[in-house]
């Protein structure tokens, strides 16, 4: 750690991002890192990187081009030609029937840089960023590799083209060539950076930008595999920081806070990163910086370009909460917290705090510096530890970005689906909307006379999706798709093979895939047969596309069987691309770069294809329901085919068996668990023969399918424990244990998950109930004895997601009609957050955050006992174990369901011993376990209700995941544990 005056630091880094003049030859490959379109100038700025002599060199160039948008034409079109020169497009949603009548929308294509801001704000493609439009209308794509056709001179990081003209889209082929990634041996990465702020407070309340200063701003740049670390610190009093030689951080002291913030912005321009990362920056850091600047604008500069203020866009998360997202124009800005919390692939981490994510992916933790201690250090001018803490918080996000190869992931989305780097935290429905918009407007058809492809454009009007999903209720008496202004097609003109989806004005309740109710128990040598991409296959088979919907005069909606529909072709293209990318990936035995590149691309294509079904679930549930209905029928057919192979002569002869039966013991949406029963003495090599039998069953079943349906043998389960629907675990033939839906929930304390899994492992590996219970008791005893000693408090905590979304609009003081709104429920998460706010902690959870907490041993309800883990002091507070014991009670009852009444006494003995241990020092809610007889009458009533709800004409064993779950119907036990208060 070395202290520098700011001017000296600027001089030291003056050449950091300025390589001087250099040539970029036609042999030098460069990568487009960031695109920015200036509507006022009608000019595209391309920020690029190239590797010359194993070092990253950065430059930019400008391209003169007009960017187009679309707006609806409302002219009455009395004359043959429109004065607005509009084009008539076929509507993407429910267009009608070709050859009879197709609904049209008249659209004006106009130049954005010449239009009024009001036109651009109200255009039909307003959900797109300008860079999305660049990707669709030009060959320039973020993440693409390119070369100049002629040697270019770079001066002051700018490549200006020839002396006679600047780069122009019309001369693209003269100036540029696209580079096939297959010809590359290494990638070109963006220069990364991350910042983080530390704020002051009075120690009792959370920091407020209106009164509390920014103590320090950490800033780290990662370039050429090296870190440049900075810490800008503010203190109104002259302060000395001891220099150290084991830390290469550059520290600059300021006695004026605004000067510090301005210097930070200036250092961004000097170091010139391509990507600026932060962690929860959209919610905390950026609004706080803006608050401290007060009326001064936040302006970011790059190269010699005009300074630009960040722009904001409203982001709605999965809980429906609204948060501003900040875009930095010349730079890529990514809030990693928002990225992780909105990405469905990140469900494995306990929560989305930086320490948790870093520990999971990197094996690194933040420096442990309590916020109250930091404020005390600042007040006594001991700033060196704060600087280390601040910089470490900047290092971890960069390491995560590199480790998870996020750059290639983001750029794959740009190249494959016309997304842009500003779409990185957008939800999956935005991705599908962008893909559908581009696929619709570039759609083609085969000319029957010439046999050649010709343009057949449709127009994707996102407003139509809002109407059919019920977001816009133009007619309150009607619902959904019936509100579309479409000409109804006569019944006689509906194609014969069209599928009737039901009334257009129906109110739809989503119904999920088929799930069998299993009998709880332990099964040996079961195997799973799963459909390959079931819903994708269904969507292709039935031609599921919004452009295939037909509104009929009889009041129904029909699905046309047109295999050339836009989404059907898109799905076929995605599946073909994935096969190609996987093949190319697997052929890369020498190039790790190409392997990773193709792996990212196949994952991107897979994610997009799998999301289209969910897209229908959001915007048109009728179609999603029909897809799941077909899926349920396919699962029934598969079960029938599998069980029909029992005692099949061909199987008996091939494997020298006297008899064999196949029973599907469980099924869920697209998978089946099959239990083969035969005399194991008749086979020599048990595992190999079982795998051969499974493969044979797979082949026989697939030979019976049509329309491209395929099943695959996935797992041979040496031991399978089935508990109930969507809750099971198994030991596979590779000796690996897999848990699905059971003992995986994040709201269960870590130590309990470990204890339960260790106990269950004794059953899976040894089939020994005694070892299971002994392991359980030992684990619980150990964690009780080591609480607040060798074990982390995090292992004992619960967590709950905080959601501040008020939901329905509350009644105003002027509104005298209608019922009064209900009082807001105080959840555990809300209660804990209020405590954190009142105590003034350094991190206050926002919407969607999971808040870790423990219960303290006081009198009251669970919500009143809840206390945030961050503030829990085991020296001053006594923990309440009652919620832990409630979870243990559930697990013990699950063991009863699996093993039945025969093991109830052993289980009760273990349960009682653990409860006595945990209740020994507790003052309130002291309870003990008691075995009680299950009320069979109530169970039968529940069975009757469940059977009545099943209208699929199935057997009683069948149900759908949308039906209410019946846990007792297939259980083996007639007793269960309940917790009763101990008698005093």
Swiss-Prot record:
Residue numbers spanned by region Monopartite nuclear localization signal: 939-948
InterPro entries reported in the protein's UniProt record: DNA-dir_DNA_pol_B, DNA-dir_DNA_pol_B_CS, DNA-dir_DNA_pol_B_exonuc, DNA-dir_DNA_pol_B_multi_dom, DNA/RNA_pol_sf, DNA_pol_B_thumb, DNA_pol_palm_dom_sf, DNA_pol_type-B
Signal peptide: none
GO molecular function term, any single one: DNA-directed DNA polymerase activity
Residue stretches of biased makeup (Acidic residues): 947-966
Catalytic activity: DNA(n) + a 2'-deoxyribonucleoside 5'-triphosphate = DNA(n+1) + diphosphate
Pfam families: DNA_pol_B (PF00136), DNA_pol_B_exo1 (PF03104)
TM segment ranges: none
Compartments, as annotated in UniProt: Host nucleus
Region (Disordered), start-end ranges: 943-969
The protein's Enzyme Commission number: 2.7.7.7
UniProt GO BP: DNA-templated DNA replication; viral DNA genome replication; viral genome replication
Keyword annotations from UniProtKB, A to Z: DNA replication, DNA-binding, DNA-directed DNA polymerase, Early protein, Host nucleus, Nucleotidyltransferase, Transferase, Viral DNA replication
Residue numbers spanned by region Bipartite nuclear localization signal: 804-827
Protein's name according to its UniProt entry: DNA polymerase
Source organism phylogeny: Viruses, Viruses incertae sedis, Naldaviricetes, Lefavirales, Baculoviridae
